């Protein structure tokens, strides 16, 4: 009879979890969107266990995530991505992820939330399945430059939506290749809103210490990880580091670092003590200045600018791209540098402007004969 007693205790605990977790999710929904969001389906404990084969290792999705363990599964006869929160994730963060994911699920450039299971602690999230789990394998496979530009434009489109579609501004705050997914059609989708920060209506910034906590946790998660083929992003906005203010420029700065990751700037200068992936090393030096006191006051854009001046565009951009796409990729690289603070032309005012310029670059890439006239406007 002990097994029956244990079963009843576990069922009672799961019922309590639903009540407690549901209260936190509701609170986040009210705070983020005044309770107005897409319906959130509640999957049962048994459905999740069956879909993941009791979270079997063979069902694990191959990806690195600071906050989640990701599993492949089948629910309602469709493939899904099931994200189980780690215990480093507090309840408020995961419930914020649920709330904001539900708000943006109708947009094509966000990972679509199908539902969640509140019987677990922390809750389990169920998303549409992304066949290409992260950008890491993509970057190491050297995709064409048109595809890279398209991915950047789609991610910029998602950030623009976060910044402008609601009465309050939402700052993603932890953009990196590990928070971006690709579906079966190669469409980029932004996910993971655990650290999403809300700027109150009528304000342009907010003070927040979430970013510092996230980067410390991320550093510990990635420590000793090699061969990822991507830089150790996100890149912290220097204005945030000096003032603690989170603004739309916080996302713009991280997005610029992501753009540089897409062109895979590579090592050309041993004297700078860079790793095999130059941009990863640059980001490491910027994110973790305590590792090397020589770089404490040396922002990322100074590193990149110095390397470009010394070696030139063709020496630092992925060799598969440098010969076939000179005009659009140079414009792409220039825009990335402007996003991270380089003074190259007019300053960027918002992600709306970044998205518009990426559309021009993408158009010029598809119609090479118009490259020079298109690039002159950027």
UniProtKB/Swiss-Prot annotation:
InterPro entries for the chain: Kinase-like_dom_sf, Prot_kinase_dom, Ser-Thr/Tyr_kinase_cat_dom, WAK-like
Residue span, Protein kinase domain: 34-378
Keywords in alphabetical order: ATP-binding, Nucleotide-binding
PROSITE patterns for this protein: PROTEIN_KINASE_DOM
Similarity comment text for this entry: Belongs to the protein kinase superfamily. Ser/Thr protein kinase family. ZRK subfamily.
Induction data: Induced by elevated temperature (e.g. at 25 degrees Celsius).
UniProt free text on domains: The protein kinase domain is predicted to be catalytically inactive.
Binding site for ATP: 40-48, 83
Single Gene Ontology BP annotation: cell surface receptor signaling pathway
Native source organism of the sequence: Arabidopsis thaliana (Mouse-ear cress)
Quaternary structure, from the entry: Interacts with RPP13L4/ZAR1.
Protein name from the UniProt record: Non-functional pseudokinase ZRK6
Cysteine-cysteine disulfides: none
GO molecular function, one term: protein kinase activity
Residues making up the signal peptide according to the UniProt record: none
């Amino acid at each position: 009879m002990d097994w029956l007693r244990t079963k009843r205790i576990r069922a009672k605990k799961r019922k309590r979890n639903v009540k407690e977790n549901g209260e936190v999710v509701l609170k986040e929904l009210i705070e983020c969107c005044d309770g107005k969001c897409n319906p959130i389906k509640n999957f049962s404990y048994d459905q999740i266990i069956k879909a993941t084969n009791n979270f079997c290792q063979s069902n694990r999705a191959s990806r690195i995530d600071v906050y989640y363990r990701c599993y492949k599964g089948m629910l309602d006869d469709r493939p899904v991505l099931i994200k189980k929160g780690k215990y480093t994730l507090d309840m408020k963060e995961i419930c914020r992820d649920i709330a904001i994911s539900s708000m943006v699920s109708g947009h094509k450039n966000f990972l679509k939330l199908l539902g969640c299971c509140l019987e677990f602690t922390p809750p389990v999230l169920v998303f549409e399945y992304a066949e290409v789990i992260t950008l890491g394998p993509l970057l190491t496979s050297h995709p064409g430059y048109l595809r890279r530009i398209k991915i950047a434009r789609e991610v910029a489109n998602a950030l623009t939506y976060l910044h402008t579609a609601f009465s309050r501004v939402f700052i993603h705050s932890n953009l990196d290749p590990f928070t971006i997914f690709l579906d079966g059609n190669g469409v980029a989708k932004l996910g993971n809103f655990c650290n999403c920060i809300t700027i109150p209506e009528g304000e342009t910034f907010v003070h927040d210490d979430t970013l510092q906590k996230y980067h410390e946790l991320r550093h510990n998660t990635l420590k000793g990880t090699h061969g990822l083929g991507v830089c150790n992003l996100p890149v912290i906005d220097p204005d945030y580091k000096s003032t603690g203010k989170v603004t739309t420029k916080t996302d713009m700065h991280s997005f610029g670092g992501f753009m540089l990751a897409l062109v895979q700037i590579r090592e050309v200068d041993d004297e700078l003590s860079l790793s095999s992936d130059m941009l990863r090393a640059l980001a490491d030096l910027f994110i973790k200045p305590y590792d090397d006191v020589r770089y404490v006051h040396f922002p990322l854009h100074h590193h990149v600018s110095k390397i470009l001046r010394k070696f030139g565009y063709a020496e630092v951009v992925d060799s598969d791209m440098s010969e076939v796409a000179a005009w659009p990729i140079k414009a792409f690289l220039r825009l990335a540098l402007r996003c991270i603070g380089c003074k190259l032309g007019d300053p960027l005012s918002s992600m709306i402007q970044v998205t518009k310029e990426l559309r021009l670059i993408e158009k010029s890439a598809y119609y090479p004969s118009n490259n020079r006239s298109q690039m002159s406007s950027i």
